[in-house]
Amino acid sequence: MMIYWIFLGLAIVAEIIGTLSMKYASVSGELTGHIVMYFMITGSYIMLALAVKKVALGVAYALWEGIGILIITVFSVLWFDESLSPLKIAGLVTLVGGIMLVKSGTRKPKKPNSPNRNSGEHHATA
């Protein structure tokens, strides 16, 4: 199961690199940025497709997009001098909260440690 989470992590990293390369290519006009973008976005979708074999689609997609948006926004501010308004910050905080809710909502309930009552054993009751 752990390998599928690794696939998801690689999908997120590839998406971030691909999207930042797209911005770099549009600013610089260099062909290299477009080539990196094509390979990274393609790789991102391939890794995401592998991840959703065992990771719930809603969780995988929320993490893939959400973490990607968060990190891309930070690097866009640092590298491309994009603005970060209080409204954008509030949106990112809401996004992180939403990701946490989606992820925590998919946990499997823990099995009780008590013996199974339907195992054929009969107990006297008072």
Curated annotation (Swiss-Prot):
SS bond partners: none
Keywords from the UniProt entry: Cell inner membrane, Cell membrane, Membrane, Transmembrane, Transmembrane helix, Transport
Pfam families to which the protein is assigned, alphabetical: Multi_Drug_Res (PF00893)
InterPro entries to which the protein is assigned, alphabetical: Small_drug/metabolite_transptr, Small_multidrug_res, Spermidine_export_MdtJ
Cellular localisation: Cell inner membrane
Topology within the bilayer: Multi-pass membrane protein
Transmembrane residue ranges: 1-21, 32-52, 55-75, 82-102
Superkingdom classification of source: Bacteria
Region feature Disordered, mapped onto this chain: 104-126
Principal localisation: membrane
SUPFAM superfamilies, per the entry: Multidrug resistance efflux transporter EmrE (SSF103481)
Any GO BP: glycine betaine transport
MF (Gene Ontology): amino-acid betaine transmembrane transporter activity; antiporter activity; choline transmembrane transporter activity; spermidine transmembrane transporter activity
Annotated signal sequence range: none
GO cellular component: plasma membrane
Function: Catalyzes the excretion of spermidine.
Assembly and binders: Forms a complex with MdtI.
HAMAP family: MdtJ (MF_01598)
Family: Belongs to the drug/metabolite transporter (DMT) superfamily. Small multidrug resistance (SMR) (TC 2.A.7.1) family. MdtJ subfamily.
Protein name: Spermidine export protein MdtJ
Organism expressing this protein natively: Yersinia enterocolitica serotype O:8 / biotype 1B (strain NCTC 13174 / 8081)
Lineage: Bacteria, Pseudomonadati, Pseudomonadota, Gammaproteobacteria, Enterobacterales
Gene that encodes it: mdtJ
